[in-house]
Amino acid sequence: MCDYGTRPKLSRRSLIAGASTFLTAGMLPRFGARAEDKEAAPNAIPPSEALERLKAGNARFAADGGKDIDFSAKRAARVKAEQPIAGILSCSDSRVPPEIIFDQRPGDLFVSRNAGNVVSSYGLASFEFAVTSLGIPLIMVLGHKGCGVVLSALAASTQRKELPGHLPELVKAIEPAVITAHGKHPSDFLAASIEENVRLGMKRLKTKSKIIGEAVMAGKLKIAGGVYDLETGVVK
């Protein structure tokens, strides 16, 4: 017989121990997935093929808005596992949705977004997970024309404009790209800074993560970059 009037006492230590067991049993096995699982995965394709798929998808989107994708299709299959063909580090700008821009289905892209498409420690960890556990063959850093955060970095760098809250920290991460662009004396300072920020992101992905860097050196992973044109829909 159950005694519903008596509740077991749980100490803080027992709760922590239980949570630790759950994490170990439920999450950690995903890291270092079996080789045979990765070989059978649909995303086990060369980096060059993954990049070509993105290019083809963007061409479709820019031409006619892309395919009429049923986002509910194959929902049951996606519950079992995710097998994205690429990782995308994109700006948070609401006009720059990677899945739509590249005309991809749910489950095709592993996306990390923040204002200014900046490489952060959390972003690095996310892509390290995608490389080691999901086997993505490609990571693209995606900037866009007219990026407001890069414009703020320009103002902070050239006009010494003060920014509120945590914005200075974000702008500081972009400032090296602005300085590099300024040294090249471009006719369009903002456009050049946006492009340099993409290049900076690509470099940081390879140099700040041993996991990502080694995957690139081994030829298993490619780091690419692009700038999205809001007017034409084209990524270059």
Give residue spans per PLM region.
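Short glycine-/acidic-enriched loop or helix-start segments at secondary-structure transitions
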Residues: M27, P98-E99, V150-S152
